[in-house]
């Protein structure tokens, strides 16, 4: 009979908030269902990942790892040379932590960690957030025990007998925020999110829309603008020169406060942001990042547009006057806004974190037989 001990789950992935936040949501649910569970994140050396994990009370370690896709020859050689080191580091972490299960959430760091976990005969599963799977998850699907998917379109990319449709998990603080009654406030507030890396072209469009020719029609709309670090200074100056009072930050750490203020959003189409907006019932104007791998942001966006919760524009075709018109059409038409809010909530993932942990439980129980 095996000795009873606290369950241990190792999660791996990261490099963007889109990978990290679903992992945090799954970890939170795992700790609820397994009181006293030990959780370890294995990720990249990105400072923002470490700060985010610390804010949510989780421990993380980093390994040396580089992406393979879309690299020039020099970068590709570097990534391949580092890969054996990544695998050795992963083996060392696995030997020390001895997890009951390993969950990969995508990103290049996932590859060596999940592959080594399989070599160590640990139960493994991956979670895919996007409509078009990333390279790491496509390759790992052949090795792992289960594949959890967020959007229906990605299911066909994986072995059918391994796929479980779970949806994309949302952090518990945002689920709690969605359950709160909305405050009655003056005016309409637009929130602009360019993704965790910011978005220069999107920033330019927003600034032109709010301070350029024709911006008078947006005078009654409050604006909150996440710029990313590189564009912060000039965006702030542009609003200041125009006498526009705008809440501008490179990144928002307290997304609860920001989301609670927002009535409408302009955003990229990362899968995790979309799941959060659907949970909160926020109408959104989507401008997918045109250089996303396999055009996955466009595919993500189409799911929410078809469901009636979003409007969609290609960055290459969108002009500031068109953006102004789209914002005004939602801001001034309460019926349309409420319809989009309803549709967003209808598209929201239902207990995605619980479904992922249910799969974890099945694999752990099977391994203990």
From Swiss-Prot:
The enzyme's first-digit EC class, named in words, is transferase
Pfam name, any one: Glyco_tran_28_C
Q: Which GO terms describe its molecular function?
A: UDP-N-acetyl-D-glucosamine:N-acetylmuramoyl-L-alanyl-D-glutamyl-meso-2,6-diaminopimelyl-D-alanyl-D-alanine-diphosphoundecaprenol 4-beta-N-acetylglucosaminlytransferase activity; undecaprenyldiphospho-muramoylpentapeptide beta-N-acetylglucosaminyltransferase activity
Tell me which CDD domains the record gives.
GT28_MurG (cd03785)
Q: What is its EC number?
A: 2.4.1.227
Q: What is this protein called?
A: UDP-N-acetylglucosamine--N-acetylmuramyl-(pentapeptide) pyrophosphoryl-undecaprenol N-acetylglucosamine transferase
Q: Does Cell membrane appear among the keywords?
A: yes
Q: Which residues form a coiled coil?
A: none
Q: Which NCBIfam families match?
A: murG (TIGR01133)
InterPro entries under this entry?
Answer: GlcNAc_MurG, Glyco_trans_28_C, GlycoTrans_28_N
Q: Which GO terms describe its biological process?
A: carbohydrate metabolic process; cell division; cell wall organization; lipid glycosylation; peptidoglycan biosynthetic process; regulation of cell shape
Question: In which compartments does the protein localize?
Answer: Cell inner membrane
What keywords does the record list, in alphabetical order?
Cell cycle, Cell division, Cell inner membrane, Cell membrane, Cell shape, Cell wall biogenesis/degradation, Glycosyltransferase, Membrane, Peptidoglycan synthesis, Transferase
Summarize where UDP-N-acetyl-alpha-D-glucosamine binds, as residue positions.
Answer: 16-18, 130, 171, 196, 297
What pathway annotation does it carry? Cell wall biogenesis; peptidoglycan biosynthesis
GO-annotated cellular components: plasma membrane
> What protein family is recorded?
Belongs to the glycosyltransferase 28 family. MurG subfamily.
Q: What does this protein do?
A: Cell wall formation. Catalyzes the transfer of a GlcNAc subunit on undecaprenyl-pyrophosphoryl-MurNAc-pentapeptide (lipid intermediate I) to form undecaprenyl-pyrophosphoryl-MurNAc-(pentapeptide)GlcNAc (lipid intermediate II).
């Amino acid at each position: 009979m095996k000795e009873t001990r606290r369950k241990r789950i190792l999660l791996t992935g990261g490099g963007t908030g889109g990978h990290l936040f679903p992992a945090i949501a799954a970890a939170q649910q795992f700790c609820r269902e397994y009181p006293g569970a030990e959780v370890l994140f294995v990720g990249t050396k990105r400072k923002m990942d470490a700060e985010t994990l610390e804010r949510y009370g989780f421990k993380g370690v980093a390994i040396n790892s580089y992406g393979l896709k879309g690299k020039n020859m020099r970068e590709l050689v570097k990534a391949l040379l580092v890969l054996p080191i990544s695998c050795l580091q992963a083996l060392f972490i696995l030997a020390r932590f001895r997890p009951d299960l390993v969950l990969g959430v995508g990103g290049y760091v996932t590859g060596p960690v999940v592959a080594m976990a399989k070599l160590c005969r640990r139960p493994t599963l991956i979670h895919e957030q996007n409509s078009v799977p990333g390279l790491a998850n496509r390759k790992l699907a052949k090795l792992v025990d289960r594949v959890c998917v967020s959007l229906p379109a990605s299911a066909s990319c994986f072995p059918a007998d391994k796929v479980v449709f779970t949806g994309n998990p949302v952090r518990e603080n945002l689920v709690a925020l969605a359950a709160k009654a909305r405050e009655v406030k003056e005016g309409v507030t637009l929130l602009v999110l360019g993704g965790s890396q910011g978005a220069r072209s999107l920033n330019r469009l927003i600034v032109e829309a709010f301070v350029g020719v024709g911006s008078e029609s947006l005078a009654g709309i409050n604006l909150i603008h996440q710029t990313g670090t590189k564009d912060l200074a000039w965006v702030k100056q542009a609003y200041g020169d125009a006498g526009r009072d705008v809440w501008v930050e490179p990144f928002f750490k307290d997304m609860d406060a920001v989301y609670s203020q927002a009535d409408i959003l302009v955003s990229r189409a990362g899968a995790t942001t979309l799941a959060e907006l659907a949970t909160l019932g926020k109408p959104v104007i989507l401008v997918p990042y045109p250089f996303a791998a396999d055009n996955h942001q466009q595919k993500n966006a189409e799911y929410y547009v078809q469901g009636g919760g979003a409007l969609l524009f290609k960055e290459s075709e969108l002009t500031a006057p068109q953006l102004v018109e789209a914002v005004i059409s939602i801001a001034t038409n309460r019926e349309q806004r409420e319809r989009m809010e309803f549709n967003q909530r209808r598209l929201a993932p239902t207990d995605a974190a619980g479904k992922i942990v249910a799969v974890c439980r099945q694999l752990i129980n099977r391994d203990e037989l």
